[in-house]
């Protein structure tokens, strides 16, 4: 699905790195909580290892940039909590409506 304008694509490209950095900062804080929690060091290690393995698949961590996948990346970012509808204020109304509909917001 590629219904978005060239302007929306340029905005997306300009924002994705910042969104990913903010999302990874949030994840790092959650990892610190895991490591600081109660339990055996080995349990915390393996819990964290499993979590990182899952998290690194998120678009908020990494995604291969392509305009044809912009829709899917943005839906994933919304569903992961890497971005919120407020983060889309610079985008076209059409894009915001589509995101709101498909993200179930």
Where on the chain are the PLM-derived regions?
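Acidic, Ser/Pro/Thr-rich low-complexity regulatory regions
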Residues: 1-105
